[in-house]
Amino acid sequence: MTNFLIVVATVLVMELTAYSVHRWIMHGPLGWGWHKSHHEEHDHALEKNDLYGLVFAVIATVLFTVGWIWAPVLWWIALGMTVYGLIYFVLHDGLVHQRWPFRYIPRKGYARRLYQAHRLHHAVEGRDHCVSFGFIYAPPVDKLKQDLKMSGVLRAEAQERT
């Protein structure tokens, strides 16, 4: 039971970690170089942004190895990171960005809220003034729309296009 709780706790900590990395590194001056590819239209199977997943996979692989040899708790933490990575792949890459061979757009419930929240994240050009940086948790869509409206960024972008 303890190992299961370690995995669940790690998934929750990974959501906080992913939010922080997404908000302050990927959308900051340090990480925008990789993440920018995710906010641009393209027809490639992969994006430079996918390197972030590779970084977390390397960390998990190291933790699996160290956990197997010296500190078993690290193995379970690595498993939690891997579970989070799978959830991320299904929800973000699959559901939201349709990076799988079939198309599915959720019509209601949690999946719909997650889908809409991340679409609103992409409603802004560039790295500033975006909303909704988590991947498993999404704030209420009405609040995100209000935040975007209050920022004035959508009006400014609409005026630039005319």
Curated annotation (Swiss-Prot):
This is Beta-carotene hydroxylase. It catalyses: all-trans-beta-carotene + 4 reduced [2Fe-2S]-[ferredoxin] + 2 O2 + 4 H(+) = all-trans-zeaxanthin + 4 oxidized [2Fe-2S]-[ferredoxin] + 2 H2O. GO terms for biological process: carotene metabolic process; xanthophyll biosynthetic process. Pathway: Carotenoid biosynthesis; astaxanthin biosynthesis. GO terms for molecular function: beta-carotene 3-hydroxylase activity; iron ion binding. It comes from the Bacteria. Keywords: Carotenoid biosynthesis, Oxidoreductase. It comes from Paracoccus sp. (strain N81106 / MBIC 01143) (Agrobacterium aurantiacum). The keyword Oxidoreductase applies. Its EC number is 1.14.15.24. Catalyzes the hydroxylation reaction from beta-carotene to zeaxanthin via beta-cryptoxanthin. It is an enzyme of class 1 (oxidoreductase). Belongs to the sterol desaturase family. Residues 8-135 form the Fatty acid hydroxylase domain. It holds the Pfam family FA_hydroxylase. InterPro entries: BETA-OHASE-like (IPR045019), Fatty_acid_hydroxylase (IPR006694).
